[in-house]
Amino acid sequence: MQVSRVLAALCGMLLCASGLFAASGDFCDSSLCLNGGTCLTGQDNDIYCLCPEGFTGLVCNETERGPCSPNPCYNDAKCLVTLDTQRGDIFTEYICQCPVGYSGIHCETETNYYNLDGEYMFTTAVPNTAVPTPAPTPDLSNNLASRCSTQLGMEGGAIADSQISASSVYMGFMGLQRWGPELARLYRTGIVNAWTASNYDSKPWIQVNLLRKMRVSGVMTQGASRAGRAEYLKTFKVAYSLDGRKFEFIQDESGGDKEFLGNLDNNSLKVNMFNPTLEAQYIKLYPVSCHRGCTLRFELLGCELHGCSEPLGLKNNTIPDSQMSASSSYKTWNLRAFGWYPHLGRLDNQGKINAWTAQSNSAKEWLQVDLGTQRQVTGIITQGARDFGHIQYVASYKVAHSDDGVQWTVYEEQGSSKVFQGNLDNNSHKKNIFEKPFMARYVRVLPVSWHNRITLRLELLGC
C-alpha cells in the first residue's frame, strides 16, 4: 500500500512537471541541452534549456565550480574558460589547450603518422625548445605514407544517427530512458548519454555504416555512468565488412579472434589501433566482458582509401585569415565589432561570434578559401552556428574551384552541377566527399538553401 502511494506521488510529480514544461513552450531536440536538461522553444523559436539541479549555463553545461571543474580535457591538457559568457554555439564555455603531440577538441588524439598498413612511424609535433630528431619524411605525393588517424564522425556528427545500429537497447526508468545506439558518441553528455545493450542480450553488438569503403585504423572507447554507477566494456572484439552481410573478425597472432582491452572506468579514454588497418564500410564492436552493463561511447579513426583526406588548414589556422574572403559579411546591430567575417568561418571555431554569415540571404553569396598553392581537394566538412541563440546554417550548397581566382568551375557529377546536403543544426559536422577529386588553389562554397541566415564554418579535405 505504501509503495503504491509513493508511485502515485511520483507519477503526479512527473505529470505536473510535464504540464509546466508544456506551458513554457514546445519541446525541441534534447541533445541541444547538456546534462539531462529539457529543451524548449519560446514564442520566437528561441531555444531555452531547463537545467536539472546542480547545473546552470545556457545549455546546462556549467556546475557551481565552472565548466573546467572537473577538468574535461585529456592528456594533461589545460582547460581555459572563455571570456565570453554567451557563445555562438552549444559547446561548453571552455577550450582545451593541448600539449605537444595531441589534438582534438579535448586533446584526446595523439598526432602520430601511420603508414598505410597502420604501423607507427613518428610523432609529427616537436616542442619548439627541443632539437628535432631526424625522421623519414612521408612522401604524400606518392602515397607511400599517410596520416590515417582522423576521427570519422561519431563525436562530431559526420556519422548520422541513421548509420548507427545495435542488436538491442536498454530501456531504463520505467521505460522512459532509451539508451540507443545513436547516443554512443564519444564525450556525449547528459543523463542518458551512451548505448547500453539489453540485459537479456547474450551476444550484443553495435554497428556503424560508413556509407563507403574506407580505411579504418583504430577505435577510441569510453564508458558512461548509469543510475550513478560506472558501466563500461572491459574487453571487446571488432568485426568488419564490405557489404554488411559477411563479417570478419580482426585476428590475433595465433589466428583467433582478437580481444581488445577496453576501459577501466566510465569516463577515461582508451585508444586501440588496428595493425594492419582495415578496408571496410561496416564496423561492428562486440562486447565480450562488461562492468555492470555493456555501455559504450566511441569514435572510429581512419581516412579515405586514397589516403588524401587530411584537413587542409582552416580549423588549425594554417590557412591565414587573409586567404579567406566572401561576397559579403553580416554585422549584428550593424556594428563592425560584431561582424561575422569570412576568416571566422573555420570548423569548430568558438566564441560569441564564431562563423561567417552573409549580409543577405541570396544564392549569389559565397565563401572563398585560397589554399596558397594548388592542392588536391577530396572533401569538405561544414557546420552552422548560433547568433545569440538563433540557430543558423547552410542546408545545401554547391562547390566551385579555380586555379587563378577568376575563371571558376562548378563541381559536377553525372553531367550536372552537384548540390551537396548541408547541415541540419548549428553544431554537427556534415562531411561530403567528392567522387571526382579536383586540383585547385581556390575553392568557393555557394549556398543554395539555408535556415534563418546563411551561416557557415568549414574545413576542406585533401593533400
Swiss-Prot record:
> Protein name, please?
Lactadherin
Gene3D superfamilies noted in UniProt? Galactose-binding domain-like (2.60.120.260), Laminin (2.10.25.10)
Looking up SUPFAM superfamilies in the UniProt record yields: EGF/Laminin, Galactose-binding domain-like
The signal peptide, as residue positions, is 1-22
Role summary: Contributes to phagocytic removal of apoptotic cells in many tissues. Specific ligand for the alpha-v/beta-3 and alpha-v/beta-5 receptors. Also binds to phosphatidylserine-enriched cell surfaces in a receptor-independent manner. Zona pellucida-binding protein which may play a role in gamete interaction. Plays an important role in the maintenance of intestinal epithelial homeostasis and the promotion of mucosal healing. Promotes VEGF-dependent neovascularization.
Keyword terms: Angiogenesis, Cell adhesion, Cytoplasmic vesicle, Disulfide bond, EGF-like domain, Fertilization, Glycoprotein, Membrane, Repeat, Secreted, Signal
The record's GO CC annotations read:
acrosomal membrane; collagen-containing extracellular matrix; external side of plasma membrane; extracellular space
Which residue range or ranges hold the F5/8 type C domain? 148-303, 308-463
Q: Where does the motif Cell attachment site lie?
A: 87-89
- Any notes on this protein's domains? The F5/8 type C 2 domain mediates high-affinity binding to phosphatidylserine-containing membranes.
Question: Can you give the residue ranges of the EGF-like domain?
Answer: 24-61, 64-108
The organism's taxonomic lineage, starting at the top = Eukaryota, Metazoa, Chordata, Craniata, Vertebrata
Instruction: Give the bilayer topology.
Output: Peripheral membrane protein
Where do the record's glycosylation annotations fall on this chain?
Answer: 61, 266, 316, 426
Q: In this UniProt entry, which cysteines form S-S bonds?
A: 28-39, 33-49, 51-60, 68-79, 73-96, 98-107, 148-303, 290-294, 308-463
Q: How is it modified after translation?
A: N-glycosylated. Isoform 1 also exists in both an O-glycosylated and a non-O-glycosylated form.
Q: Please name the GO terms of the biological process aspect recorded for this protein, alphabetically.
A: angiogenesis; apoptotic cell clearance; cell adhesion; phagocytosis, engulfment; phagocytosis, recognition; positive regulation of phagocytosis; single fertilization
Organism of derivation? Mus musculus (Mouse)
Q: What tissues contain this protein?
A: Mammary epithelial cell surfaces and spermatozoan. Isoform 2 is present in brain, heart, kidney and spleen and at low levels in lung, liver, small intestine and testis.
Subcellular locations according to the entry:
Membrane; Secreted; Cytoplasmic vesicle, Secretory vesicle, Acrosome membrane
Query: Which CDD domains has this protein been placed in?
Result: EGF_CA, FA58C
Q: Which InterPro entries match?
A: EGF-like_dom, FA58C, Galactose-bd-like_sf, Neuropilin_MCO_CoagFactor
Q: What induces it?
A: Isoform 1 is induced by insulin, prolactin and hydrocortisone in mammary epithelial cells. Expression of isoform 2 is repressed by the same treatment.
- What SMART domains does this protein map onto? EGF, FA58C
Question: Which Pfam families does this chain map to?
Answer: EGF, F5_F8_type_C
Gene Ontology molecular-function annotations: integrin binding; phosphatidylethanolamine binding; phosphatidylserine binding
User: Entry's PANTHER family?
Assistant: F5/8 TYPE C DOMAIN-CONTAINING PROTEIN (PTHR46806), MILK FAT GLOBULE EGF AND FACTOR V_VIII DOMAIN CONTAINING (PTHR46806:SF11)
